[in-house]
Amino acid sequence: GQNNHDWKRRSPVMMDTLQATGRFHIERAIVTKEEIANFKPDFGKYDVVLSNYNGEPWLEETQRSFVKYMKEGGNLVVVHAADNSFPNWQEYNEMIGLGGWKGRNEKDGPYVYWKEGKIVRDESKGRGGSHGRPLEYKVVVREKKHPITRGLPTEFLMVKEELYDRL
């Protein structure tokens, strides 16, 4: 129920795509600003949470419940701007690895990038999180055995997507 991108159009497309496989039972939660105080799902009922959310912070009770779910083996898929949703929630940002926007700067951690075959952690000062216009770019899979990338080709073309930078 909250995002700076067109969630009303994109969320149903994701749902339809997943349901068409016949492998998923899907429940959808739409939470408006007015309803956030009552958003207290039982995350333990789900094998995976797919988030297309970028809105008001969750209640601390809901955050604790979600952290517990993840520590007990829960799974999370963060879609596009959902990496921006909770800039001040440390555990969430640890779950997603790198987030951006909403005032992120060097105090939130180093910039992390790949240079000459190595991961670089750059402590330079400055704001973080941006992207240009959607474009095609090559994705190179460096960890082929990781559960997220297992089965993907070594290289593939990402078609018309925003390439995040300064993370």
PLM regions with names:
Residues 3-86:
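Helical hinge/lid and interdomain linker segments adjacent to catalytic or ligand-binding clefts
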Residues 56-150:
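A glycine-rich, often tryptophan-bearing local segment used as a flexible ligand/cofactor-contacting loop or short
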Residues 140-167:
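ATP/pyrophosphate-binding catalytic subdomain of soluble kinases
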Residues 10-12, 39-40, 134-138, 166-167:
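A broad, low-specificity signal for short, low-complexity segments enriched in glycine/proline
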